Amino acid sequence: MILEQYGITNFFKEQKIAATSSYGRVTAVFRDYYRVITENEEFLASLKRGNFYELSSTSLPTVGDFVEISGDLQILSVLERKTVFSRMNKDSAEQLIAANFDYALIVMSLNHDFNLNRLERYLTVAWDSGATPIIILTKADLVEDLSFYAQQLKAVAYGVPAYYVDNLSHHGFEALESDLKPNSTLILLGSSGVGKSSFINSLAGTNLMKTAGIREDDSKGKHTTTHREMHLLSNGWIVIDTPGMREFGVGFNQAGLETTFSDVEELAEGCRFHDCSHTQEPNCAVQAALEDGTLTMQHYENWLKLQREMAYHARKNSPALARQERDRWKVIQKSMRTHFKTRPKK
């Protein structure tokens, strides 16, 4: 019964474990230990080292994972995941953040934190995770006219539900809560100080999280969440909070990028050449859309930037691609410089 409240489904219960083991869910990750809840208790567990010695870091448990627990409180294995969110660190290694969530809530505040390029980056990793993305715009009480932001969102996140909320008055939460499925697991993504902790408190109906805020002078956030942790709310939702991430590297799974930039991908299907770089080739549908204003330069440049970032991480993990990708991007960058110099000003 307890694990059902914490989101276990037949997908996980049908994965076989030893008769002497039990199912558990990781609710927090610390340096050397994992906080795990089972049907009977919540405790700090360690890894059975022999079982994880030769596995990659992505095979280690993360918040939200369902795991096999031994009688002596050791994690024996990680069950197959339904969804997973990871980011690339500075060494181009994949770093797990959380697993097995139904919704990825991208939280941005309606001040200087509102950034379309960052939103597209978050949407890319959200789609790539396998979860359903939802945009949460906090501090809506500070904005008189929301139509400006609605138009901005329509340009880069068409079809993704967006909710304008005020954590103080609770405005906007009723619509959001009616659309979330009961007993769902939610992960919150966003920069420091955008109101993620206050949002959790509003969703929970109690002061569950410590809050800080954004400095008024520069709109920079202050960290209140220092580690990844799961919270079971009294209304049945399970929330995974993460430390604020203003910048993070995307991985090299093309699916999330194709979904976020589906408009550009659809345009690219109309190009004359199947291997079009969308920078200099004749009869390029993407360049034509740039010329007639159908596609904005900002959206296009962010698409190219994320494409290149994914290619970089792919090269780091597959050295054989390095020379091929380097030569290709030399051509693209040269043609982009030529395009920007010769493009008539409007």
Each PLM stretch: what is its role?
Residues 106, 135-137:
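Structural beta-sheet core signal
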Residues 117-128:
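Histidine-anchored nucleotide/phosphate-binding helix
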Residues 1-116:
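N-terminal accessory targeting/assembly segments
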Residues 196-212:
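A conserved segment at the C-terminal end of the G1
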Residues 132, 139-194:
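Canonical P-loop GTPase G-domain recognition
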Residues 110-111, 139-140, 242-245:
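Conserved Walker B
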Residues 56-66, 71-72, 80, 86-103, ...:
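Helix-rich effector regions associated with P-loop NTPase G domains
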